[in-house]
Regions:
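Anion (oxyanion) recognition and catalysis
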Residues: 25, 50, 95, 130, ...
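Active-site acidic/histidine proton-transfer and metal-coordination neighborhood
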Residues: 73-174
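Hydrophobic residues in well-ordered beta-strands that form the structural core
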Residues: 56-58, 142, 177, 239
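Structural motif corresponding to the early beta-alpha repeats
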Residues: 15, 30, 34-120, 243
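Short phosphate-binding/catalytic loops that engage adenosine nucleotides
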Residues: 29, 54, 138, 233
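Active-site loop signature of alpha/beta-hydrolase-fold enzymes
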Residues: 64, 147, 182
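Histidine-acidic metal/acid-base catalytic patches
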Residues: 1-28, 38, 89-92, 98-100, ...
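Short, contiguous strand/loop micro-motifs
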Residues: 7-8, 31-33, 76-78, 113-117, ...
Length: 260
């Protein structure tokens, strides 16, 4: 059975952020992930991790103004210096928190910029980040996201992600494969994860439709969990879903699959 990490941006939101670490540990999780750590000091978060015996699995590079609808800046030609500063900030946090991977959100395709320039910017930024992170012993992952939830999101399918990875040409760049997003965009989940096991360093989950916990929608998670074991996936699976009711009430799927 895969190792599951609680996504604290979406789970245990009944409590303040720093209280969610203890809640996750009490629920049986051994790892955590979330969108961003930057509203808190790395020392504050590290103390919560240590107090609750949790592994910091992943967080994202700074992604612009989230409250204003930005969803990454890596493909934006006029934000390169901001992106590079964000890489340095992420490294500083990861070196304290102990995670060995960070995720890059491409962002929403900018209006009035030609496709070639957008792609060139994204590739160059990924190359810069992959090299800087590699020097710090940290892997870079990038996530394809469906364009129904985030219209215009630049990186939105596996084939595109693999093409971008080839252009970057770094052995330190991997895929974060989000089962929910890719079910919407392309399906064929098991075959894709099998074919690209070597390029996938992190997986996230939610059911579809609704982005709720496994067992509430169309995805056969029992099969997929067993499939990940069969193909030898060694990474974490981040639980990035919206509980249908409360977090605690929606954790039955973990017990059903003997995951906690």
């Amino acid at each position: 059975m895969p190792r599951f990490a609680a996504n604290l941006s979406m789970l245990f939101t009944e409590q303040d952020f720093l209280a969610r670490f203890e809640a996750a540990a009490k629920a049986g999780f051994s790892g955590v992930e979330y969108l961003f750590p930057y509203d808190f000091s790395s020392a504050e978060i590290k103390a919560k991790l240590d107090a609750n015996g949790l592994t910091q699995v992943l967080f994202n590079l700074p992604a612009g103004d989230w409250a204003k609808g930005e969803r990454g800046i890596a493909c934006l030609p006029d934000r390169v210096e901001e992106f590079r500063a964000g890489v340095d900030l992420a490294i500083a946090y990861a070196q304290v928190l102990g995670n060995t991977q960070v995720n890059c959100l491409a962002g929403i395709r900018p209006q009035g910029v030609d496709d070639a320039t957008v792609e060139k910017t994204f590739v160059a930024n990924l190359k810069y980040a992959a090299d800087k992170l590699q020097a710090a012993g940290i892997k870079l992952v990038m996530e394809a996201i469906n364009t129904r939830d985030i219209p215009g999101f630049y990186l939105n399918n596996t084939a595109q992600a693999l093409s971008i990875r080839e252009q970057v040409g770094s052995a330190n760049l991997f895929l974060q494969y989000d089962i929910y997003h890719m079910q919407i965009m392309e399906g064929d989940l098991a075959r894709t994860m099998t074919a690209h096991l070597g390029e996938i360093n992190h997986i996230q989950l939610a059911d579809n439709p609704g982005r709720n916990e496994p067992g509430t929608g169309e995805i056969n998670y029992r099969f997929l969990f067993e499939h990940l074991d069969r193909i030898g996936y060694q990474g974490w699976v981040g639980c990035e879903y919206k509980p249908l009711t409360t977090t605690e009430a929606g954790l039955g799927w973990l017990k059903t699959h003997n995951a906690i």
